[in-house]
Each structure stands twice: as structure tokens, then as C-alpha cells.
Amino acid sequence: MTPSLVFLIVVIVVVEGQGWRPWDRFNHPGNFGNWGGNNWGTRQRNQEPHDIPPPVPPPGFRGNNDRFGGNIIKVVEIIDLGKSKNRGDILSDFKDVHKKHRHLGRKEWKGKVKQFCHRFPGHPNCRRGKVPDQKELEEMIGQFSKGGIGRFLKRVPKIYIEDPLARVDPKLKGFLENAGRGFGHVSSEHVNKLRDICKRRKCREQPESAKKTRELFTQKLADFETKIAGKDKTDSVQLRFDRTLQIKEALLEKGNLTADIVPVDNGVYDLDTMLTEEQANILLNELNKAGVGDDEIPLPDADTDDEDDDDSTNSASGAAPGSSRLKKSALYFEGNLIKKWDPSSPIRYVLDSSLEDLDKNDVRAAIYEIEKNTCIRFKELSSPPTGSHIVYYKVDSPTFCGLSYVGRADPANPVYLSFGCDNNKGVAIHETMHALGVAHQHLRNDRDQFITINWSNIDPQQYDAFVVVDSKLYTSYGVKYAYDSIMHYNGYTAAQNIAIPTMNPKTNSAVNLKVLGQRQKMGTTDIELLKKMYCQPGCDDKNVYCGAWALKDLCKNPGHDQYMAANCKKSCGLCAIGK
């Protein structure tokens, strides 16, 4: 057996918490995802009925078919990323040059240094107004071992985030238990449990799989955006992934865990989502990182007609490229962090040629389910249009189920699916709902009322998978927490010991633990949320906390009903009923 195939078999158990259910090996033999138990390697289509069938069967619908066997070689090829194109990772290039004791010619060295200092303008060796000498290479690389990538990156723009409670009755504030904690709050008890874990395992070593994942999706995203923009977008993608790492580091810093844990640097946030630069900048502002980093100092004798005009230099604050001053702009809680699609026209989407017929059927079935239950409409196109749209890609990899942005992204939304997980239609629904702007259920601000996080069993390097969303930036719209939400992860997500849950339901735990992470169909609350987001035009909440107040039954509370009726129509269910 080849080393690559051995790795393939071993890595199956670490897929993130969507459709893979590793605990089935202990509780339900024979149903380990689609690849385990008695049917390993066999795709049983008749075990995946469409629970809410579309009015007309999706084009290309077929019955049983084995997809795994035909893709095994592709999977191994994806794993062996050492042979793939290392697109734009100048830091890896420098490490390779140093490791092999290569001496670069003057022109080649200048070109690489320019690329390095464009990506890391805050690096000390890029702040001297001259081209660093190649003899400084070891020093340049060594700076990164000290941690804190944010100090090397372009300055985080200052963004004014309005306090939604500034002009609210103090009595209403009393109903918000966690409002004052801020994004990234973690108790000292939980911090100590994470530290205890790191006494027994290595928490400061970057997993090799993380590097490969980042390389893979840097290439995928850069290819996707370059094709649309007509110019190389690698720098823009690298900055977004660097910002994602910066957020993970800032979250650990807030918990005083920097000395104990190095977060996974794979470009992915919360296991299956990507951040736009705008979203990353907003979250960094919430973590008090506004102004961290520096502005680029042009190197002498360097070309000036480069790609600095790409969107990697544009910030959520509206700062002009190259601006050395921090500018401000207001953040409206329902508008900026998550961009929604225009509900008055169909969302255009394309099924990339990388999808097989059965893969396309799964995506179409997912879209049919959303259409059947809501007012949202989609339109399939044969080729990418101009303007906003979704493109579904297949990435043959056993290490993930799906990956997407949360909300509409510019220039378009790529959705990456492996089609190797339990119930691929459900995974496609999950990722499409991310694209529509829906965050994970288990990261809601009220999640601790419904589930208990087992901090003694989570992977500390994937700490971001358990950080609740910022209460000032997300709203529930008054939709209740649901264990059967298709946006919930399974109870064993990011577990060290996959036989022990990382999330336990507080209600009817034995039954609901099996429900967590279901991908059979949209839950009733998923449908309700999408309807409130897209099917009630002209009716909005005026405060991001309306959802939380509605869940406290304040819509009919005699002391607050007038305020709620005037300011929280959507969360109180006072809008015209959409489909």
C-alpha cells in the first residue's frame, strides 16, 4: 500500500463536523458516513431519499451509483500537494531557498523581496527604505517564529461600529446577559482546560495538513477570481487568509492562550467558511486590532506599475489604496458584515465542469429544497455571468465536506464541495445557506442555554470553531435555537477523542445528540430564518438585538410591546407573511 493511500485512510476520521459522523463507528456500525462500516466504498443512493422532493425531479437524476471508486486516484492526487503549484506563497519560497542554501541572482532576489514586502509591509526588514540583502534571509524568516502575523500585514483599517444599545431603554439592556462580554470572550475555567490539553499534546506545531489546505484553496480562489477580474488576484487571496490567521491569533490572545496554542493556518474560519477582507477587518476591529500593521514603503528601484490597485488594499472603511491614515465609516448591523442577495431577482448559479452528473443532481436538489420552502429563486446558467453569482466546484478531498463564504461576496461566490460526505444534498444546502448569509447554529450568542461545550475534549488549535458570534453583528430574528438545524455541526466536531462529544444538548441529550449535524433536510427554523431574511421586503428590525428580545417574549410584554412593535417588526413576526 502506498504512503498516500495510507494517509487517505487515516485522514477520514478528521473531516469537519458536517456530514461525517465518526461516532457511528462506536454506536451505529455500518454507517460511517458513506465510506465506513459494511458498505465501505459503496455509494448507496437508495439510502439518501430526498425528504422534501422537488416538484419535478432535478435534471440528470439517477438511482444508485458508486462515485467513490472513480475518484480515488483524484483524491490521492489532491493529498499529494507537494507536487502542485505553490501559487504566490512567498514565505514558503523563502523558507525553501534558505533550506536548500540557494543563492538567487540580484534580479530574482529583488523581485521576491518586493513580493515579500508587499505582502508583509510591517516586517522590520521592509521598513528600512532599502532592499534587504539576501544575507538577511534567515533573520527575515525567523521573525515569524515569534508569532503575531498581524504586525507584519497591511494596517487594519479603523471602522466605527455603532453601539446598538446607545439609545435603548436601560431595562431592555437587562435582558441581554452576554451583551457586555464582547466577541471572543472565554472564561478562565475554559482557558485552564485548554491549557491542560496542551500539556498532553503539541499545540504549537502547525499541522502539515493545514499548509496543504491553504495551498489548495489559495490556488482555487486565485484562479477563480483571476478569471473574473482579468488580473492576478493571488495577493488579495493571501491577505484574506493572513487576516483569518490574524483573527484566530487575536482570539487566543484575548484568552491569554498565545503562549500555549498556535492556531491552524489553513485559510479557513470555523472549519467550513471563508472570510471576505471586509468581514475580517470588522472582526479585527471588534478584537481591538484596528491600526495594527503598517503601510507599505516602496522599495528603491522597484517597479511602480504593479498590481497594487487590486482590492487587497481596499478596506471596509473605504480607505483609499496606499492611505496612511485611518478612516472611519459607520457599520450598520444588518448591512455590512453579511451582504445579502437581491430578493427581487433569481440568484444565478453555475455548476462547474468538475462536477459529475450525480454531483450536479445533489446541488440541484439542494436548490430545489430551498426554493420549495421559501420565496428565494435561483437560475442555473451554463457559464459565469457578470455580476454576483454562485459557482459550485468539486474538490476531491477526504478532509472536508464543503467550504463557502457567509453572505454575498465580491466578485462572486465560489462554493467548494467534496461530495464525499454523508448526504451530499444536505451539505450543499448547508453551504448554500452560508452563501445566503446564514451562520452556524451552534455559534449563536444563546447557544450555552442549549448545549454544553466539553472544553476538555476540543482541539485547542481549532478554538475558533467554538467561539460564539459577535452579538452586535448577528441577529437571530427571533428564530428559536434548534438541534435539528441543518446549520448545526455534529456533537463530535473538532474532538480530540472522537468517542467523546464536544457538544452535548442540554435537553433530551441522548436523543438530540444523534440529531446534531443532520444533513437530511432543512429544519423548520432554517426555513423560518430564510423567510425572515429574504421574504419580507420593506419590513426590517431597527436594532440587532431585536431577535434576542423577541426570544425573551418581549414582543407582547406590556412594558416593552410598543417599542418592539415599532422597532422589531421582523423579529416579532409583524411583517407581511412571505412564502
Swiss-Prot record:
Q: Which GO terms describe its cellular component?
A: extracellular region
Cite the cofactor comment: Binds 1 zinc ion per subunit.
PROSITE patterns reported in the protein's UniProt record = ASTACIN, SHKT
Acidic residues bias spans: 293-312
Q: Which residues are glycosylated?
A: N256, N454
Give the principal location in a single coarse category: secreted
For this protein, the Enzyme Commission number is 3.4.24.-
Q: Single Gene Ontology BP term? A: proteolysis
Its keywords, alphabetically, are: Cleavage on pair of basic residues, Disulfide bond, Glycoprotein, Hydrolase, Metal-binding, Metalloprotease, Protease, Secreted, Signal, Zinc, Zymogen
EC main class here is hydrolase
Kindly state the tissue distribution recorded for this protein.
Expressed in the anterior part of the intestine, CEP neurons and to a lesser extent in hypodermis.
Required co-factors: Zn(2+)
The residues covered by the ShKT domain are 539-575
Q: Which residues form the signal peptide?
A: 1-17
List the residue ranges of the region (Disordered).
35-58, 293-323
Q: What are the disulphide bonds in this sequence?
A: C375-C535, C401-C421, C539-C575, C546-C568, C555-C572
Residues in a coiled coil are: none
Q: Where is the Peptidase M12A domain?
A: 329-536
**What does the function comment of this entry state?**
Metalloprotease.
Protein name as catalogued: Zinc metalloproteinase nas-11
Organism expressing this protein natively:
Caenorhabditis elegans
